A protein has these predicted regions:
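Residue-level marker of alpha-helix boundaries and capping positions
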Residues: 16, 86, 108, 142, ...
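Conserved SAM-binding loop
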Residues: 14, 43, 106-109, 167-168
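N-terminal helical cap/lid subdomain that shapes the substrate entry/recognition surface
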Residues: 2-93, 98-102, 115
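Asp-based, Mg2+/Mn2+-dependent phosphohydrolase catalytic module
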Residues: 1-4, 97, 113-114, 119-216
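N-terminal start-of-chain detector that recognizes signal peptides
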Residues: 25-27, 77-79, 107-109, 138-140, ...
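Short, conserved structural micro-motifs that define repeat-unit consensus positions
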Residues: 105-106, 151
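Non-catalytic, surface-exposed connector residues within folded enzymatic/regulatory domains
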Residues: 19, 68, 86-89, 111, ...
Length: 216
């Protein structure tokens, strides 16, 4: 089957920044006297929106103002950590150029908020391939992964049914969200050594491994 569009997760997929996020959370949580194991981070943090993360860590009693303040604090730490190491995953830019030359639409669906998305646009030249108004990011109007809303919204941005799209993801909740969205094909991007044995999808570590014939 030939697919008509691509949806990329961003963090841990196009930008391998999981270690930066984990370190930022370590620094943030230490300030608040909280410790999480690596397994707890995978469950409570990876692939989640900041409001869901903060509720998972601090409980439902956390206020909306605390969620906002804590999230901004953590993301400021994260941006400071990764500012000097902003680069796309291997082969990603080649794939962008291929898709652009073929006229195949593609976009990003991310749990990141607008502050980080703007940071990526400014420092990674995302506007070479992407338009901000075509990207789906966490604006507080949809639930985090594994809820499929972010991918369904991205498919709408592409004006395609999800079944005609290929979704690239790295996190377990993200893969589950792609499944629930009804993606035509799913690629797993193994950026941090996760165990994906439960899933039947091709696992890649370089975007040059993507079969271009899928879009012929």
């Amino acid at each position: 089957m030939n697919y008509k569009g691509i949806i990329f997760d961003f963090n841990g997929t196009l930008f391998w920044d999981t270690a930066f996020h984990d370190l930022a959370f370590d620094i943030f949580l230490e300030k608040h006297g909280v410790q999480l194991s690596d397994d707890e981070k995978r469950v409570k943090i990876h692939g989640q929106t900041n409001p869901d993360i903060m509720r998972g860590i601090f409980g439902d009693q956390i206020t909306e103002k605390e969620i906002l303040d804590f999230s901004q604090d953590k993301e400021a730490i994260y941006r400071q950590l990764c500012i000097n190491d902003l680069k796309f995953a291997s082969g990603a830019e080649d794939l962008f150029d291929f898709l652009h030359d073929k006229g195949i639409p593609f976009t990003i669906a991310t749990s990141a908020g607008i502050e980080n998305v703007s940071f990526y646009f400014e420092n990674m030249n995302l506007n070479r391939w992407f338009r901000l108004d075509k990207i789906v990011y966490n604006n507080g109007t949809f639930d985090g992964k594994p809820n499929p809303d972010v991918f369904l919204a991205a498919a709408l941005k592409l004006n395609l049914p999800p079944q005609e799209t290929v979704i690239f993801e790295d996190s377990i909740p993200g893969i589950e969200a792609a499944e629930s969205a009804g993606a035509g094909k799913i690629y797993i991007v193994n950026s941090y050594g996760e165990n994906y044995s439960r899933f039947p999808y091709q696992i890649i570590t370089n975007f040059n491994e993507v079969d271009r014939k899928l879009f012929a």
